[in-house]
Amino acid sequence: MDREMKRHYTLLVDFLGKILGPDYEVALHELLDDSNEIIAIANGELTGRHLGSPLSNKMLEFLTSRLYETQDYVLRFESTSVTGKKLCSNSLFIKDPHGRLVGLLCINFDSSRYRELSARVMDLCGSLLTPGAPSGTNLIV
């Protein structure tokens, strides 16, 4: 990845991290012959990753399968953080002008607090209904 491309994508990582918020990790991986590591990251506390962290196993699978030769990106695949959180992940394959893969822009979303909130709301709704009562007869006072 050349200097200008790094600058552009590093700015994008910072921008996306700020507008998407703490439930989204945004990571830029540079792919070199001798190392593949994170060179920019926003909200890394979500997964515990930091500058210099290696590629995830899922990303290594994508590289090994050469998925980038037929697709520009992969959307909404499940991954797991080092802390065991289930994440919704998305990855953009970054290519140079010659079509050679030089990086990955990865966005990982932790929806756990929204799933927990949804479950609590459903529990609340269920506790307001009297079991066995005919529909439409439950009054909420």
Segment roles from a protein language model:
Residues 58, 62-124:
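Sensory/regulatory domains in signal-transduction proteins
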Residues 13-75, 80-82:
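Structured interaction and signal-relay segments at domain junctions
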Residues 1-19, 104, 109-141:
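Juxtadomain coupling helices with adjacent low-complexity linkers
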Residues 39-43, 89, 131:
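Short amphipathic alpha-helical patches
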